[in-house]
């Protein structure tokens, strides 16, 4: 549902942020 979608989006943003930080 909405919760899992939000979690997936948050995960993608986190991965992108980590890549940019490196």
UniProtKB/Swiss-Prot annotation:
Keywords annotated in UniProt: Amidation, Antibiotic, Antimicrobial, Fungicide, Secreted
Biological process (GO), any one: defense response to fungus
Secreted keyword on record: yes
Tissue-level expression: Expressed by the skin glands.
Main location: secreted
Positions of modified residues (Leucine amide): 22
Function per UniProt: Has antibacterial and antifungal activity.
Similarity remark: Belongs to the gastrin/cholecystokinin family. Magainin subfamily.
Protein's name according to its UniProt entry: Peptide PGLa-B1
Naturally occurring in which organism (per UniProt): Xenopus borealis (Kenyan clawed frog)
